[in-house]
Amino acid sequence: MLSKLKLNQLYFKDTSFVNLMTKRIFNVLLVANPYDAFMLEDDGRIDEKIFNEYMNLSLRYPPRFTQVSTEEAAWKQLENTTFDLVICMPGSDNSDTFEIARSIKEQYPHIPLVVLTPFSHGITARMEHEDLSIFEYVFCWLGNTDLLVSIIKLIEDKMNLEHDIKEVGVQMILLVEDSIRFYSSVLPNLYKFVLKQSQEFATEALNAHQRTLRMRGRPKIVLARTYEEAMDLYNKYQNNVLGVITDARYPRGGVVDPMAGIKLLAEVRSRDPFVPLILQSAEVDNKVYASRYGASFVDKNSKKMNIDLREIVSDDFGFGDFIFRNPDTLEEVARVHNLKELQNVIFAIPKESLLYHISRNHVSRWLYSRAMFPPAEFLKQITWESLQDIDAHRRIIFEAIVKYRKMKNQGVVAVFQRDRFDRYSNFARIGEGSLGGKGRGLAFIDNMVKRHVEFDEFENATVVIPKTVVLCTDIFDEFMDTNSLYQVALSDADDDTI
């Protein structure tokens, strides 16, 4: 079994979520004629719709949209406001949207530009003769406000990708698709699913502040539109790929290759036998290739394609509950909702089921998808081939969870929850008021112990504070008011009477 020193080295470094997603889009300039801008707004303002979408997904910092329809108005806004993104909507009236975009790119090369086009044959034909190289992405407006949220999140993910992966090991979902209409439909569904899942796993945080920060650790979604672009991303971040979703037909070597996606599957699978792969194609015959490389298959022609994709992503990429299955029948053996439940059942899981999951890196992938990077990184390295002892694996998983939970509880003032407070909980409060002097002092010492890892280096000695639950001042006030005790407490009565 691994030495205590190695366990300490791997677990006791907390994840600094506060340093993630530092680059944000706050102001968006929308270049569109009045009719197209109205079409986006439909029955309400864009700002209002985006704000509502952000609130529904527990997201903060919704961007502000500014709409202009002429080059003069665009320059006036750019001179007075710092914009983080420009969205251009080419209309059917042959307006000079692309000319405005080119002028903006020349003057402000650091601002990303995106094309958002209504689905019409006239505009599509016109775009074929335009130079779109200045644009980050081209999207097709299908009447869903979710697309605007997806555009913003896709750009933010791209801006923060390299830093966040290097900082804490954030995971990446690689989507490879060249059909504008198709990825304009898939991305909103994929983002909504991932953001909803991040809301779920954030509930394991110990207080509201940590919940908000932990959502920054969600997997990022990255869009590639050619084989070369996909391979560049995979080569650079292959140790942080949560899964790959690929079309079958897209450009490779400068020409459309009907087997590009199959070749990508083969290359990725040759390097990683465990990473989840999904092949989505309108050609059902490609299902054979999906099976060959251990990939799931999604039929693009299916009316419930988005539902099928969401279910496969949930099962294969480690989202949702962890379901232990019988390897022969794939029937459910046990289900865990959170880390504490996994800790409680790990010794009761049948050997065959546990072997099935650990030999495929399912446990580490589940932890990665929930932004629990320290134990995920450690367990990913403990392969079945290197250990080949099922009981040792149980103990290592258990010890990893215990050490991680202890580390996360230390130095944090948690909100008391009866179903979560156990022997590994450290400091919790009941109420929203002040901790008081004694409680604050204990919380401070606990925080200092967590900051100074040298306290763990003393043999046969552990530096900790007593396990503590603090009743905040508002709970005390409520108790005094409910029982009408203030009149007695503040009177001149002697101590025995009080």
PLM region descriptions:
Residues 1-66, 130-137, 141-220, 227-228, ...:
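Non-catalytic signal-transmission and effector/linker regions of two-component phosphorelay proteins
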Residues 10, 39-42, 46-51, 62, ...:
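Conserved phosphotransfer microenvironments
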Residues 37-40, 121-125, 183-184, 285-288:
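Short, charged/polar "capping" segments at the starts of alpha-helices
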Residues 116-118, 280, 300:
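Hydrophobic/aromatic residues positioned on beta-strands within the core alpha/beta folds
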Residues 127-138, 289-297:
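As written
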Residues 285-409:
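Terminal, compositionally biased segments used for targeting/anchoring and flexible tails
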Residues 378-498:
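Nucleotide/phosphate-binding sheet-loop regions of phosphoryl- and nucleotidyl-transfer enzymes
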